[in-house]
């Protein structure tokens, strides 16, 4: 990382974007693709410590990091609050998972005639200090930092356990839809993990539906489709959800 200080009257966003584009085109090849992020902080107090200026420009970058459609980000006062929130979520996550603070909620799914088909697995964080947290306050952060796979795996286990309970009680016609995020494909051996879970709980794979957004599939079509095809052949039902993402989605849209 490097810092450049320019007079406000000399700052030209288009010129900066053009230079970044040129740099990236010179550096990339068939294997590696360079992506540059620029954080812009407007200095309003010349007596402010240089380190603070640098940190604020970095905060602006952190807001768009991982989003390859973004290049330049401008600091605003909300960045500090957002960054502190993100850091606290990440710092508390592993302990919260270990302590059982995350809970699976089930949202019923019906067909057009009102017949119950099953449910979608949602997640809530029963935080000891902040109360019940909804997915929009932490899932995006976990996805951004790559640790969402730990929560996904936890929910998959809970869903399989619940299906086993239903089967034991004689309710053998219902499924639970679980979310598959982009990070799961990279941090987990997805095929072996999911087939291992249904084997562990002795349930049919057709009762554990895999919900994935088209956006996730399109991020690496070849790899994702190969894995999903293997899972479908094993017996899992694949659901494509385009109206929402992650545990915040409201309903299944269509089945592949």
Question: Could you say what each language-model-derived stretch is?
Answer:
Residues 1-8, 26, 30-62, 70-76, ...:
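A short glycine-enriched loop-to-beta-strand structural element that forms part of the catalytic core
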Residues 11-18, 48-49, 189:
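Short, conserved charged micro-motifs
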Residues 103, 118-120, 173-177, 207-211, ...:
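Structural preference for beta-strand elements that scaffold enzyme active sites
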Residues 195-256:
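The catalytic core of metal-dependent phosphodiesterases that act on cyclic dinucleotides
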């Amino acid at each position: 990382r490097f810092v450049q200080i320019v007079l406000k009257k000399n700052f030209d966003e288009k010129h900066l974007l053009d230079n970044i584009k040129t740099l990236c085109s010179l550096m990339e090849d068939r294997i590696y693709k360079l992506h540059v992020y620029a954080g812009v902080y407007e200095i309003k107090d010349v007596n402010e410590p240089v380190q603070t200026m640098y940190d604020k420009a970095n905060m602006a970058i952190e807001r768009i990091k991982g989003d390859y459609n973004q290049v330049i980000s401008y600091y605003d006062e909300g960045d500090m609050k957002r960054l502190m929130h993100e850091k606290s979520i990440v710092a508390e996550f592993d302990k919260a998972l270990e302590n059982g603070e995350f809970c699976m909620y089930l949202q019923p799914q019906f067909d057009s005639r009102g017949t119950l088909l099953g449910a979608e697995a949602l997640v809530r964080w029963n935080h000891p200090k902040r109360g019940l947290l909804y997915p929009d306050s932490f899932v995006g952060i976990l996805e951004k930092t790559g640790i969402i796979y730990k929560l996904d795996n936890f929910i998959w286990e809970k869903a399989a356990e619940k299906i086993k309970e239903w089967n034991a009680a004689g309710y053998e016609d219902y499924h639970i839809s679980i979310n598959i995020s982009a990070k799961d494909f990279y941090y987990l051996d997805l095929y072996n993990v999911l087939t291992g879970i249904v084997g562990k709980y002795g349930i049919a794979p057709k009762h554990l539906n895999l919900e994935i957004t088209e956006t996730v599939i399109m991020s690496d079509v070849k790899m994702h489709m190969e894995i999903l095809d293997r899972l479908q052949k094993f017996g899992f039902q694949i659901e494509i959800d385009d109206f929402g993402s992650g545990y915040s989605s409201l309903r299944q849209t269509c089945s592949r």
